[in-house]
UniProtKB/Swiss-Prot annotation:
Keywords from the named record: Carbohydrate metabolism, Cell wall biogenesis/degradation, Disulfide bond, Glycoprotein, Glycosidase, Hydrolase, Polysaccharide degradation, Secreted, Signal
Organism: Aspergillus flavus (strain ATCC 200026 / FGSC A1120 / IAM 13836 / NRRL 3357 / JCM 12722 / SRRC 167)
Positions of the catalytic residues: D217 (proton donor), H292
Signal peptide region: 1-19
Reaction equation(s) it catalyzes: Endohydrolysis of alpha-D-GalA-(1->2)-alpha-L-Rha glycosidic bond in the rhamnogalacturonan I backbone with initial inversion of anomeric configuration releasing oligosaccharides with beta-D-GalA at the reducing end
Subcellular location, record wording: Secreted
Physiological role: Pectinolytic enzymes consist of four classes of enzymes: pectine lyase, polygalacturonase, pectin methylesterase and rhamnogalacturonase. Hydrolyzes alpha-D-galacturonopyranosyl-(1,2)-alpha-L-rhamnopyranosyl linkages in the backbone of the hairy regions of pectins.
Gene: rhgA
One GO process term, biological-process aspect: cell wall organization
EC number in record: 3.2.1.171
Glycosylation sites: N237, N252, N319
Protein name: Probable rhamnogalacturonase A
Family: Belongs to the glycosyl hydrolase 28 family.
Superkingdom to which the source organism belongs: Eukaryota
Residue pairs linked by disulfide bridges in the UniProt entry: C40-C66, C219-C236, C342-C348, C370-C379
Source organism phylogeny: Eukaryota, Fungi, Dikarya, Ascomycota, Pezizomycotina
Length: 467
């Protein structure tokens, strides 16, 4: 799918090659092989699809029997879950969620936490499995103290795919200190409030692709520490937008690529946010972005006032490439499509903005503003960062080629915070003109194995120097 000849690879920039996955991602053993070893059906452990009986104990018992090789199987049906599960250890295991789990109970924490595991898979064989967090029951009273839906800590060689995460009381999906992960074919749908992050990543060697997020905070966001992160075919559908940060002390992020990101009615197309702090971000590519109706477009803000100032001169940003951005922004005079604000004592260096064409939906002018950002393109200045500057450029003519496609599933309004959010169907398209890397599970002639085979093939192609 992205297989290139050695000659073609030699012509690629070092930045693009280096900012790739560092090796294999995803589980080492197929789910079918795990199932043939052992299958632990939660209904054999007391689970009832009555939307009342807590499924937590049944999952724990099934996990105890299948964690060292096998599949915990949750059949189709509606299940209640008042427990907060911490599933620890295990190898060559999987959780197959073909039913729908409804969060009950008022405890915080994590609905599911998987930790210290390897060769793991969390998936639906039908693409109809879901976790319904019913977060509105907290949010209608102004509370964000409910549980996160799905968190991974210290897990290696794993995947999450073909499931929907809906209306989390807090964050939806977090990858904390993990390695060699693949996240794909997902729909995440949250309320119209901050603090309801879609996908948060502070890990190593992670491939996120073909994911739709609706919320009002992070779409797919990289936090520190992180390296070798590839994010592709992302649909931020009335969301906060993709981002990096917030960044604080001892930031350590490198070799990150975002590619094919479509953003509709969100806070930003991409934001890097910090205020003080220390450490660095290096080797970042942001390419093939389409946006419509967003408040901000490219927003690099080293003095972000929405976070408290962190001790330090600032986070050093170096070697950032922004290319092939198209579309429109909400109001280009109030919030221009390019904002690069870097700390005077930690200027941004080696930034390139190329093939960037966005135009305002309101009025007939827009601004490009840069402060202590050095490189090439628009308001950036040449230099090595030894001198400071601040400049604003006003543009009154629409750039050539800014027109861009839209998506047929663009939402007409946000989901609120005081009523249940419906479970969505996982889409089959996440970026205009881009084909998902893997068919939805259960799609091709009802054969989930075809989707699994496609996913496995694409995983092994994504190694350093083979993309």
């Amino acid at each position: 799918m992205h297989s290139l000849s050695l000659i073609s690879l030699a012509l690629l920039s070092p930045l693009l090659v280096n900012a790739q996955l560092s090796g294999h991602v995803g589980p080492l053993t197929s789910s079918s092989s795990k199932a043939s070893t052992k299958t632990c059906n939660v209904q054999d452990y007391g689970a009832k699809a009555d939307k009342e009986t807590d499924i937590g104990s049944a999952i724990e018992k099934a996990w105890d029997d299948c964690a060292e090789g096998g599949v915990v199987y949750i059949p189709s049906g509606d299940y209640a879950m008042s427990s907060r599960l911490k599933l620890s250890g295990g190898k060559a295991s999987a959780i197959q969620l073909d039913g729908i789990i409804y969060r009950t109970g008022s405890d915080g924490g994590n609905l599911f936490m998987i930790e210290h595991s390897s060769d793991f898979e969390f998936f639906s064989s039908t693409s109809q499995g879901a976790i319904q967090g019913l977060g509105y029951e907290f949010h209608k009273d102004g509370s964000l103290n409910g549980p996160r839906l799905l968190r991974f800590y210290d897990v290696t060689d794993f995947s999450v795919h073909d499931v929907a995460l809906v209306d989390s009381p807090a964050f939806h999906l977090s990858l904390d200190t993990c390695k060699n992960a693949e996240i794909y074919n997902m729909a995440i749908r949250g309320g119209d409030s901050g603090g309801l992050d879609g996908v948060d990543i502070w890990s190593e060697n992670v491939w996120v692709h073909d994911v739709e997020v609706t919320n009002k905070d992070e779409c797919v966001t990289v936090k520190s520490p992180a390296k070798n992160i590839l994010v592709e075919n992302i649909y931020c559908n009335w969301s906060g937008g993709c981002a990096m940060g917030s960044l604080g002390a001892d930031t350590n992020i490198s070799d990150v690529v975002y590619r094919n990101v479509y953003t509709w009615k969100s806070n930003q197309m991409y934001m890097i946010k910090s205020n003080g702090g220390s450490g660095s971000v290096s080797n970042l590519v942001l390419e093939n972005f389409i946006g419509h109706g967003n408040a901000y477009s490219l927003d690099i803000d080293g003095e972000w006032s929405s976070m408290s100032t962190v001790s330090g001169d600032g986070v050093q940003l170096n070697n950032i490439t922004v290319r092939n951005w198209k579309g429109t922004e909400e109001d280009g005079a109030a919030r221009g499509p390019i904002k690069v604000v870097c700390a005077e004592k930690a200027p941004c260096t080696d930034i390139t903005i190329d093939d960037f064409a966005l135009w305002t939906e309101s009025g007939d002018e827009q601004t490009y503003s840069c402060e202590n950002g050095f490189g090439s393109g628009f308001c950036l200045q040449d230099g090595d960062g030894t001198s400071s500057y601040s400049t604003v450029i006003t543009e009154t003519a629409a750039p050539t080629g800014y027109e861009a496609s839209s998506m047929s599933n663009d939402l007409s309004t946000a989901f609120g915070t005081d009523a249940s959010i419906p479970i969505p169907t996982i889409p089959t398209s996440f970026f205009p003109g881009a084909t998902p890397y893997s068919a939805l599970a259960g799609a091709a002639s009802g054969n989930a194995a075809k989707a699994t085979s496609s996913a496995t093939a694409s995983r092994f192609r994504h190694r350093r120097g083979s993309h």
